[in-house]
A protein has these predicted regions:
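Membrane-embedded alpha-helical bundles of multi-pass enzymes
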Residues: 2-220
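Soluble catalytic regions of membrane-associated enzymes that act on cell-envelope
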Residues: 219-287
Length: 287
């Protein structure tokens, strides 16, 4: 067998292995969202994904990203077929969201050409800021955007969630990615950006990642009531079961919630003390 054939087969095997690892990382990131809600999986999942793309050429990095993105998005938005009545929209939406990830990967691979961007801190900053930027972009475009799936959302019950009052979901998402890069660099088999004499660099990066995960817990979250009160009404319009049957008739779910809202507004018990706002549940609008 010729050397070229051996190298070609080795390259194909490496590409397949990277794609499989990307899929595992995508499923691991999915597990950080409900219903599993393992928020702590976000960081190792992203670190594993980053380890497959930060030293790969652009074509291979994009291939890994497609595997990672589709593995995360498809199970995360498995409710789409029920909502719109077709599986095609499910795959298209997952693919479009994955394309945003691909754009991010192309950008960060381009920044790796800069020598100054190869140090652990610089890489972490670039990856974190650009990830938060892509998150913000896909939350607003196309049309009104799709903010679902931000890596900030699983951190509600984690120490990193304490950053939300300071900088919103953008800061939380950036923090998750920043820590993930530090974790990835602490586990790197070889790292040309770290001088050989810095033998404690990797343990220091790992320690820094751990500290950054728990440090935001020191930020106090105020639970004091603001001046005045707000009377809130909760509306549950109900739907026919199975759910797909209700969503297959446009306007049925909205109509049910509208009738329940009118009944709530007409409740004699609320004449003297009317509510200030009525809350509808998620998925209450189907038109």
């Amino acid at each position: 067998m010729r050397t070229s054939q051996i190298l070609r087969r080795a390259s194909i095997a490496q590409t397949c292995a990277d794609a499989m690892i990307g899929a595992v990382a995508g499923l691991a990131l999915y597990s950080s969202f409900p219903p599993l809600g393992w928020w702590w999986m976000s960081i190792p999942a992203l670190a594993l994904f980053i380890s497959r793309i930060d030293e790969a050429r652009a074509p291979r990095a994009i291939g890994v990203t497609l595997s990672f993105g589709m593995s995360m998005w498809l199970p995360l938005i498995d409710w789409i077929p029920m909502a719109v009545g077709t599986r095609a929209a499910w795959f298209v939406l997952a693919f479009v969201q994955t394309l945003f990830l691909c754009a991010w990967v192309v950008f960060v691979r381009w920044t790796s050409l800069w020598r100054a961007a190869r140090s652990p801190l610089a890489q972490a900053l670039l990856y974190a800021i650009s990830w938060a930027g892509v998150d913000a972009a896909r939350s607003r475009w196309p049309w009104s955007g799709f903010p679902w799936g931000s890596v900030a959302l699983p951190q509600v019950d984690s120490p990193l969630g304490h950053l939300a009052p300071v900088g919103g979901t953008s800061l939380v998402a950036a923090a998750v990615v920043f820590i993930a890069v530090l974790l990835r660099r602490s586990c790197a088999g070889r790292d040309g950006a770290v001088a050989p004499e810095h033998r404690f660099s990797r343990p220091l990066l790992a320690l820094s990642a751990c500290v950054l995960v728990v440090a935001p817990a020191a930020i106090p979250l105020s639970n004091e009531a603001e001046a005045g009160t707000v009377r809130v009404g909760v509306v549950q319009g109900d739907i026919a079961l199975p759910g797909a049957q209700a969503y297959s008739h446009p306007g049925e779910v909205t109509g049910n919630n509208l009738r329940a809202s009118r009944a709530l507004a007409a409740d004699p018990a609320l004449v003297d003390k009317p509510i200030d706002v009525a809350l509808w549940g998620e998925g209450s609008v189907d038109r």
